[in-house]
Design a protein with these regions (language model features):
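Short, small/polar-rich motifs associated with maturation and membrane association
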Residues: 1-378, 390-392, 456-457
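Extracellular/periplasmic, surface-exposed regions of secreted and cell-surface proteins
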Residues: 152, 199-200, 380-389, 394-399, ...
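Proline-centered flexible-loop/turn and helix-kink motifs
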Residues: 164, 169, 417-421, 426, ...
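Short proline/glycine-enriched turn/loop segments at secondary-structure junctions
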Residues: 233-236, 408-410, 648-650
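Extracytoplasmic gating/loop element in the C-terminal half of outer-membrane beta-barrel translocons
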Residues: 296, 316-317, 494-496, 620
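Low-complexity intrinsically disordered tracts that form flexible linkers/tails across taxa
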Residues: 400-414
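A subset of solvent-exposed loop/turn segments in beta-rich extracellular surface proteins, enriched
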Residues: 418-432, 492-508
Length: 785
């Protein structure tokens, strides 16, 4: 008889497919087993099978509201030992990946239980997150994609942003920097605006603004990407480049579990140029010069005697005739990265808790001074205070420690010629190329140490005064603090043949010892109030509406101070610098506020014809009062044509077909600067004469030109798509064609240099983006797989 195997596990693989695994996902069952082994007073036995009578191996059986549970064995049978007889009304929860969870009420007569699990292969019943709510996938009229937390975890990356690479159509993920912990750049359906940062998608974590770098991979339950205006317009001015909605894991009501996950990975440098030794380099340079000027002969730069005898000269005097493999000096063969994650979940019908702790340690590929460490903690709590009142309290903490070299050799190391020495034979640093020595700068030229601290919270109250109507209030504070210490150390070099131990010559990357200290703290908070109403009239008319208000406030303060002329490089503090005053100092303070009103209406007739409308009115402090507010609309419609009578003959192989169309407008106000419409003054000094004495007096000056009537950049999006499933929902196809047009782009406009002010922003420029997406999938169960 065919046997069905159900694995409840978290999987961990190495980058580059090196098979090193250490996983203790089954620790989650230890509380169940321990509880079951202590003097059982009541035993429940049974079997779990499929609708085809095949045994299900590894199904999880839990007594609801308790920590007691077990799993089915290779024959599909199970035994659950309890300390006492279950109370009246108790029930078992039986679950297995790929099957619908089943609830079995316990009675006096069912000490031996037979459980039949039905396959859960209907993708259309999947619930997906949308703005300020969720819907079944079959009811969507907009374009979106989603990926669950298990798939995210299996992608074996250090950051959530990189885990999205190649995971969804229309979502492009690139990485321009390979430094440890570096986040990726995400583009949803291409570039939306030419303004820096305006093409970044809007990220919300559990409904409030956040950053993907705040998340550990094990925190994620689901990620949904809203791609068209009909889906994203409920978020208004922040959603022009798309929206990424992250749902984190909650406690649930399936008892208590503890999971530990350890991942070890190795990173290798790839696509590096082949090493060219000194002789090959000299020959190549001579050939280059000969091709440019044949009349000068073959040996225009390096003489024939030097080229032919270089290896002998190198053996006799390697300092004067070096052969340096710069890549080998600057790069390791591989770098180690590791992650530790501990998850605790506990829950019942009235309360649940999810606690995730993560630690990431990533070593860089540079020989020295490149590393990244991250500590994350996320605590999610849910409470049912009354049947009509629920609350949640979420707290997240993150600490990052990053070390970078003061001077990164990443660009130059690929083409520094081998004829320049990095070190002399006695270990002293050599001159390099005309005083530039990337190896000396990397090893002893100083570091940039960045320490970041972040705390976020979300406190939510949900009221359901009567069926179908709910009111939600959210307050979400966010605090972050960053301190950076950029300590450049003076590095002396020596020429070949110089036997002195003290040098007055320093590499060009570090001619002085200098320290820059930076401090930055930000505080923001989001307040939301929204109400949802759902009602079915008769049996055919399904209606839902949502209305809400949101307020966002952001404050930032920063401080920079630097000092040079350090007598030594041992103590990286400003007080240890030279006798001169702090040579540079600056301070900045910024504020930003947004206020929004929004609403949505959804209607479908017989789950066949769908319409949806959204409206959002946004106000931003970046614009003058007369231009501050913008209204953004969207509409979409869907038609499930497989529900029509003329499609009745295709039901054996054509399960579902829906046509979608949408139109929407979205705004953008993300530009560099918080007061682009307003003249700002910067502290400055003016120099003049008082009598015959040249005198410097403090004052203020205008540094930037402004445009008073600056207003919203607007992106209009059109989308046509289809959702199709065939062969009992095993084969699925989703296809979309989209067109985006951005008007009144917020760009800097050049002005005459003689004016003496920097260029202002203005609403100029138009950009078009178009494209298509296709997702083809097959979902099936084949034997034990």
């Amino acid at each position: 008889m065919k046997k069905i195997v159900c694995y409840i596990r978290e999987k961990s693989n190495l980058l580059v497919a090196i098979p090193i695994n250490m996983l203790l996902a089954t620790v989650g069952l230890i509380p169940f087993l321990a509880a079951a082994q202590s003097s059982p007073a009541y035993t429940i036995q049974g079997a779990v099978r499929t609708t085809t009578d095949a045994p299900v191996v590894g199904a999880t059986i839990v007594l609801e509201g308790t920590q007691f549970g077990t799993t089915s064995d290779v024959t599909g049978t199970f035994t659950l030992d309890l300390k006492q007889k279950p109370s009246q009304g108790s029930a078992l929860s039986v679950s297995c990946i790929g099957y619908k969870t089943k609830r079995i009420p316990l009675t006096e007569s069912n000490a031996a239980i037979s459980v039949v699990l039905e396959e859960d292969n209907n993708l259309l019943d999947e619930v997906v997150v949308i703005g300020y709510g969720s819907v079944q996938k079959k009811d969507l009229t907009g374009s979106l994609s989603s990926i669950d937390g298990g798939a995210i975890l299996n992608r074996q990356t250090q950051t959530v942003s990189m885990a999205l690479q190649g995971a969804m159509p229309g979502v492009t993920v690139t990485r321009t920097n390979s430094a440890p912990g570096q986040s990726a750049t995400i583009r949803i359906r291409g570039i939306t605006s030419m303004t820096e940062g305006a093409s970044d998608p809007y990220v919300l974590i559990d409904g409030v603004p956040g950053n993907l770098s705040d998340l550990n991979l094990t925190d994620v339950a689901n990620i949904t990407v809203l791609k068209d205006a009909a889906s994203a317009s409920i978020y208004g001015s922040q959603a022009a480049a798309g929206v990424i909605l992250v749902t984190t894991k909650r406690g649930g009501n399936s008892g208590t579990s503890v999971t530990y996950n350890y991942t070890l990975g190795l990173d290798f440098p790839t696509s590096m140029p082949d090493y060219m030794n000194a002789v090959d380099y000299m020959k190549a340079v001579n050939e280059l010069n000969y091709n440019d000027f044949p009349g000068g002969g073959w040996y225009q730069t390096y003489t024939k005697d030097v080229v032919d005898n270089y290896w002998n000269l190198n053996r006799e005097d390697p300092d004067k005739y070096p052969n340096t493999d710069w890549l080998s000096l600057l790069l390791k063969d591989y770098a180690v990265r590791q992650s530790h994650n501990v998850s605790f979940r506990s829950g019942s019908a009235k309360r649940s808790t999810s606690l995730n702790f993560g630690y990431d340690d990533v070593d860089g590929l540079f020989t020295k001074n490149l590393s990244w460490k991250r500590y994350t903690l996320r605590l999610n709590n849910d409470f049912e205070l009354f049947k009509w009142m629920k609350a949640s309290a979420d707290i997240s903490l993150r600490k990052t420690d990053k070390v970078n070299p003061h001077t990164s050799p990443s660009a130059q190391m690929r083409y520094i010629p081998a004829i320049y020495a990095a070190t002399l034979s006695d270990g002293r640093y050599a001159e390099g190329k005309e005083g530039s020595n990337k190896y000396a700068a990397l090893m002893d030229g100083g570091t940039i140490d960045v320490h970041g601290y972040k705390m976020t919270g979300k406190f939510q109250l949900d009221l359901t005064p009567f069926k179908g109507f709910s009111v939600t209030g959210v307050f979400a504070p966010n605090f972050s603090y960053t301190k950076e210490k950029d300590f450049q150390k003076q590095v002396p070099y020596f020429r070949a043949g110089d036997s002195s131990t003290v040098s007055t010559k320093y590499i060009t990357e570090a001619t002085t010892t200098e320290l820059k200290e930076t401090r930055s703290d930000t505080f923001s908070h989001t307040t939301q109030f929204y109400a949802n109403y759902q009602k079915t009239f008769g049996e055919d008319h399904n209606f839902s509406a949502m209305i809400g208000y949101e307020n966002y406030k952001y404050e930032q303060e920063g401080l920079l101070a630097s000092k040079s002329k350090f007598p030594h490089s041992l103590i990286p503090y400003l007080s240890a610098g030279g006798t001169s005053d702090v040579v540079a100092k600056s301070e900045n303070v910024f504020e930003l506020a947004r206020r929004s009103y929004f609403g949505r209406v959804m209607y479908n007739y017989r789950n066949k014809y769908y319409i949806q409308g959204n409206i959002r009115r946004d106000g931003s402090s970046r614009f003058a009062p007369d231009s501050r507010w913008g209204t953004f609309l969207s509409a979409s419609a869907g038609w499930v044509f497989t529900s029509e009578n003329f499609m009745s003959g295709t039901k054996d192989w054509f399960d579902f077909g829906k046509l979608r169309v949408s139109y929407g407008e979205l705004g953008n106000e993300r530009i560099n600067g918080y007061y682009p419409y307003q003249t700002t003054l910067t502290p400055a000094y003016s120099v003049g004469y008082i009598g015959n004495t040249v005198t410097s007096l403090p004052g203020y000056s205008q540094t930037a030109a402004v445009v008073r009537d600056l207003t919203w950049e607007t992106t209009t999006t059109y989308d046509v798509g289809v959702d199709l499933t065939f062969l009992k929902n095993r084969l699925s196809l989703t296809a979309d064609y989209y067109y985006k047009r951005t008007d009144d782009m917020l760009l800097t406009v050049p002005i005459a240099p003689i004016i003496g002010l920097s260029d202002p922003y203005d609403n100029v420029g138009t950009m078009n983006t178009r494209g298509w997406e296709i997702t083809l999938g097959w979902r099936d169960r084949i034997g034990d797989l």
